[in-house]
């Protein structure tokens, strides 16, 4: 794939852009093998990849420049603003909307926030796209409420020109620090969430709920985990760090009770909405810290299978030891950081790595997702 931003040295986010995707995958597999080191792996499955461009469903744009000449993108190598509205990672309709949002900010006369002077109002524009419907959630991250009337004044025209915009909100982030969003969310539309569907499973996206940025590869990740769980035929399952419930909902059926734990309340609301839409009453989702849940009194009945999908920091020593002590038949570990994955796998005792599969969730970058199936030592022979 060719990218003008990369070729001109304006953006280096896609560090591997100059290499064919096949070569990128070989490098990523080699890195994963190196990080896992001496850990024995029974089966290394072929990597899963998706489209090379037009796949990304989320844009995080820094707003720079001036109210009369705003720029949506990133600071360039020389510190000057770089407009990323034509980034080829985004679908064409998303690029068109990003370009229009530049004009919207100019018409509204909202001064971009200047970090060097701690002045201005508009810090970021966050745009999320539903792949199934092509609808958008648009968020303006502001320093204060002062610019909200300007947004409301121009919003009717924007919604008329781009009817695919379903959700619009303002996020207030008043502090002068490198933080993407604040606590308060003010909706400017009646709708407060996007609808998404992966593999026939209804999923929902709210402003603060984490959602995978590559829908095609994410749907295959969830489907693979569900297939592995189905092969195990467990009678109970936990989905820790569950987000909007993607893994647990894909595994759910009328005979499999699922407990999903996630610290972000908005994500849990999405998961509960999905469970209701699926007509399943044996799914339980709670807004709790996953480690605290596993260490607490609620976790006395150990499930047969535990899925963990932690943030980049991994699950950590305490939870690794707890899972080892629990001794479920299987642990499925989905990781976006192979370095912390390797550390955690070395700390989980009594299990063998039955399968490892790389999912190229972030083409052209160094990042990737890994799915691991860990089987209890005594259970390996019967489950293979």
UniProtKB/Swiss-Prot annotation:
One of its GO terms (molecular function) is 4 iron, 4 sulfur cluster binding. Pfam families: tRNA_U5-meth_tr. The keyword Methyltransferase applies. Gene3D superfamilies: 2.40.50.1070, Vaccinia Virus protein VP39. It comes from the Bacteria. GO terms for biological process: rRNA base methylation. SUPFAM superfamilies: S-adenosyl-L-methionine-dependent methyltransferases. Its EC number is 2.1.1.189. S-adenosyl-L-methionine binds at residues 212, 241, 262, 309. It catalyses: uridine(747) in 23S rRNA + S-adenosyl-L-methionine = 5-methyluridine(747) in 23S rRNA + S-adenosyl-L-homocysteine + H(+). The active site is at residue 336. InterPro entries: 23SrRNA_MeTrfase_RlmC, MeTrfase_TrmA_AS, MeTrfase_TrmA_CS, SAM-dependent_MTases_sf, U5_MeTrfase_fam. Keywords: 4Fe-4S, Iron, Iron-sulfur, Metal-binding, Methyltransferase, rRNA processing, S-adenosyl-L-methionine, Transferase. [4Fe-4S] cluster binds at residues 3, 11, 14, 87. Catalyzes the formation of 5-methyl-uridine at position 747 (m5U747) in 23S rRNA. HAMAP family: 23SrRNA_methyltr_RlmC. Belongs to the class I-like SAM-binding methyltransferase superfamily. RNA M5U methyltransferase family. RlmC subfamily. This is 23S rRNA (uracil(747)-C(5))-methyltransferase RlmC. It comes from Shewanella amazonensis (strain ATCC BAA-1098 / SB2B). The lineage of its organism: Bacteria, Pseudomonadati, Pseudomonadota, Gammaproteobacteria, Alteromonadales.
